[in-house]
């Protein structure tokens, strides 16, 4: 008969669960090794872990790297993982937002160069601080370059102008 009063295992983690958690810590450590120094500086890490992450790039042999990453995983156990995950998620979402904004501005540039006056009017409605004459001039130069199969120097200027307007409108300048 099975004893239902096995209180010894209540609340304890299985060996498999512990291994999963340790593997997740090692994976998080691997991700931290890919971050730049200024990004790492923003994370709440102990000095010992910072040193271990800096040393991780020195280990190139598979076995040595695996051992060192296990050590990093061990050091990760005493870190504030919720804060680290929150900051990493915030960085990822800001990068995603930046990329989405960048692609949106690229689409505006392409529409203005390939488009007509309607696209220009839509752009001016969305960005009221636009110097219409300057934008028309930049777009016209970009269209001439495109027609002559020249390098897109004027298209870059159109993009820079659009980006500057966007930053001005969003209060980043």
UniProtKB/Swiss-Prot annotation:
Query: What biological-process terms (Gene Ontology) are attached?
Result: assembly of large subunit precursor of preribosome
Matches recorded under SUPFAM superfamilies: PSPTO4464-like
What InterPro entries would the database entry show? DarP, DarP_sf
* Gene Ontology, cellular component aspect: cytosol
Q: Which HAMAP family match?
A: DarP
The family assignment reads: Belongs to the DarP family.
Designated name of the protein:
Dual-action ribosomal maturation protein DarP
